[in-house]
Amino acid sequence: RTGMRLDNSRTVSVRNGVAIIPVVGPVFRYANLFTEISGATSTQVLATDLQTALDDPKISAIILNIDSPGGVAAGINELADQIHAARDRKRVVAYIGGTGASAAYWIASAASEIVMDETALAGSIGVVVEAVVGGEETNGRKRYQIVSRNAPNKRVDLATEEGRAKVGETVDAMGDVFVAKVARNLGVEPEHVPEMGDFGGLRVGAAA
């Protein structure tokens, strides 16, 4: 069941004295029509809602419910510092149920604890700057991405064997979790699961 909306907050719900704050979708600094319609996250709104939860004596703990690929860097450092300082007042848990990447992981790292679903994705620690260059000498418009040197895997080149292999590592790891859980649920050995599932294909019910 959903919780009750916390008074004087934009996004916070409350269940059993625990404030749940969503960090969902792309992260931007300021709230606007796009963030309202698309369900993106504004660090400005998030910071205000976090403070409201901290100041409410009925709130015993805070959960940051994260499913975000990250977003704009502006405002993230201030928000993360606020979350880190909040740990001295109340327990702050970051739960990553889907994706907690880039700026979203920066936010999660400031919490007292990070809890992740086994199929969640986290990381992508690094910075990317994108620029579009246009003009006659460029034969039209070209987009460039500059990645911080500490994060060469943040934007892998799928046109290269190395890039495809790096993405394959993540896909294989997710596939291993999938197989392990199906094996547990059905009470069979993991090595039998791929064949049962036609090695990624589909079976009709009569043949399953």
PLM regions: where:
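Conserved PDZ fold ligand-binding element
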Residues: 111, 207-208
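Small-residue-centered hinge/linker elements
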Residues: 1-90, 99-188
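Secondary-structure end/capping motifs
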Residues: 175-207
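Glycine-rich beta-to-alpha transition loops that act as phosphate-gripper elements at the mouths
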Residues: 95-101, 196-199
